[in-house]
């Protein structure tokens, strides 16, 4: 068969914080959760290096998707621009 079935790939939504590199952006993804013991709402963020084919710029909200390793740090790619 010509069509291969790929596994489900993770997607995340975040804000572009840096687009100074060629074809690469840094996306900050925020996570809000309740602390298991103290029940306080905690806001946590993490940065992901993503491949940028859509030429998004800083401040834009984007959806990124997991992909094969593209470089030492890049394992995500920008799939779509959200607003």
UniProtKB/Swiss-Prot annotation:
One of its GO terms (biological process) is translation. InterPro entries: NA-bd_OB-fold, Ribosomal_uS17, Ribosomal_uS17_bact/chlr. GO terms for cellular component: cytosolic small ribosomal subunit. Pfam families: Ribosomal_S17. The keyword rRNA-binding applies. It comes from the Bacteria. One of its GO terms (molecular function) is structural constituent of ribosome. The keyword Ribonucleoprotein applies. Keywords: Ribonucleoprotein, Ribosomal protein, RNA-binding, rRNA-binding. One of the primary rRNA binding proteins, it binds specifically to the 5'-end of 16S ribosomal RNA. Part of the 30S ribosomal subunit. Belongs to the universal ribosomal protein uS17 family. This is Small ribosomal subunit protein uS17. It comes from Chlamydia felis (strain Fe/C-56).
């Amino acid at each position: 068969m010509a069509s291969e079935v790929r596994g489900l790939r993770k997607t995340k939504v975040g804000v572009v914080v840096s687009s100074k590199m060629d074809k690469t952006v840094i996306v900050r993804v925020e996570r809000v959760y309740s602390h298991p013991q103290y029940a306080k709402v905690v806001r946590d963020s993490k940065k992901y290096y993503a491949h940028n084919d859509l030429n998004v710029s800083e401040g834009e909200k984007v959806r990124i998707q997991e992909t094969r390793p593209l470089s030492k740090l890049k394992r995500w790619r920008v799939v779509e621009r959200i607003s």
